A protein has these predicted regions:
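Residue-level detector of intrinsically disordered/flexible regions characterized by low predicted structural confidence
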Residues: 6-9, 30
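N-terminal secretory signal peptides that target proteins for export/translocation
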Residues: 1-5
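Alpha/propeptide regions of enzymes that mature by internal proteolysis
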Residues: 28-392
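Bacterial N-terminal signal peptides
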Residues: 10-24
Length: 392
């Protein structure tokens, strides 16, 4: 006999009602969002261009983290011949003074083989006070310098003497001469200054310029979801930097094994599933830092759905923040507690769906790249189409 864990009948009924409303709404809306048209300047398709739309929720206008009002993204890509292929990506929660108008944040660590500066203060205080910077492993100090310099220059911060720079990284050392440390702080600051709302460039750009995913070219990916009005009408968006491996699954189909490229292939192989993924989650739902931490943890489900076993050498880090004015923190502002625990499940669903699609977009949008130690091919889109047609 299957037993339901004892967490309270009332809580259980709220969860059932929430998902019932969510499913009914998705059915009425045709279940899936409209197909996003290809950007005429970009030849590589997104997941939705291939008919892949994880989950049941609609996307926002841009199907990007910038569908959350106020969130801005900037890229700085550094490419010099085959030797230098790296960059930085900046995510700004809003366009004001981030230090004086702080957003609540939650942090989750999967496997901790990596460097995510500023994370301990985020865990302790539950807030962000700088842009989030993504870059390569050996450019983390330059990322910190960029975030600190930019913050100190903001009007109103003349007396600031401590800045918690938040910088995540993945190692792009195969396609990029990472030991050369070619990125300067002023280069990375350009990503902050250039950040804007609207469509977000994906694939081999910014911090994703030199990354590898499941043996193919990885990069930056993004996606978003809208909750129905009955469940708050909130928006949730995700941006990922993918540089990890495993046995790739696309919408449940075993693409990695079908294309004969996967972890442990020659031992069953010398395949390498190690690497890292950084996930940034933004939402306009009013959430406490505690519930943002819970939200961040759900991204690990999407990482697993794409085929990652979360290996020994993987650095899997997720940070989630809320832009809602009622939960922001200031020097003279007391935030509200935000949504109740019982209202979180639809947002958990949105986080899993958006993260999975963002990962696939990073993979599909990335181009073949000849780099420092060799060439990494982009995944064969036609082959993926054939596999999906055989495994509906």
């Amino acid at each position: 006999m299957t037993r339901i864990p004892h967490f309270g009948v009332a809580s259980f009924m709220v969860c059932v009602a929430s998902f019932s409303a969510l499913t009914s709404w998705a059915t009425e809306m045709g279940v899936l969002a409209e197909t996003v048209l290809l950007d005429p300047t970009v030849q590589r398709p997104s997941a939705r261009d291939l008919g892949i739309s994880p989950g049941i929720l609609r996307t926002g206008q841009y199907n990007a983290i910038t569908d959350v009002a106020g969130v801005a993204v900037g890229h700085m890509t550094l490419s010099k011949g085959t030797r230098v292929n790296t960059g930085a990506t900046a995510i700004l929660p809003h366009g004001g003074n981030l230090y004086r108008d702080r957003v609540p944040a939650g942090f989750h660590q999967g496997n901790g083989y990596g460097k995510f500066t500023g994370s301990t203060q985020v865990i302790e205080l539950g807030e962000l006070e700088t842009p989030i910077i993504l870059t390569n492993t050996l450019s983390v100090p330059q990322g910190m310098e960029a975030a600190i310099s930019w913050t100190l220059k903001q009007p109103g911060n003349e007396d600031v003497r401590s800045v918690n720079a938040v910088v995540g990284e993945t190692n792009d050392g195969f396609l990029n001469d990472i030991r050369g440390r070619h990125l300067r702080a002023e280069d990375i600051e350009k990503a902050i200054v250039s950040a804007k709302s609207g469509p977000v460039q994906q694939g081999s750009v910014g911090a994703g310029r030199g990354t590898i995913s499941f043996g193919w070219k990885g990069g930056i990916g993004t996606s978003s979801r809208l909750l129905p009005e009955e469940l708050g009408g909130f928006t949730l968006g995700v941006l990922v930097q993918t540089n990890y491996g495993g046995i790739l699954r696309v919408d449940g189909a075993p693409v990695g094994t079908a294309l004969d490229q996967y972890f442990m292939r020659e031992v069953i192989d010398k395949g390498d599933a190690d690497g890292s993924i950084i996930v940034i989650i933004a939402t306009d739902a009013p959430l406490s830092d505690r519930n943002l931490k819970r939200l961040a943890s759900r991204a690990m489900l999407a990482i697993g759905r794409t085929g990652s076993p979360v290996t020994n050498g993987s650095g899997d880090y997720i940070i989630a923040f809320s832009t809602h004015d009622s939960v922001r923190r200031g020097l003279d502002k007391t935030p509200s507690n935000g949504l109740a625990n019982s209202q979180m499940s639809p947002l958990f669903q949105a986080a899993v769906e958006s993260t999975e699609e963002a990962i696939l977009n990073a993979l599909f949008k990335a181009d073949t790249l000849r780099g420092h130690k060799g060439t990494v091919e982009a995944i064969d889109i036609d082959a993926v189409r054939e596999i999906l047609a055989k495994d509906p």
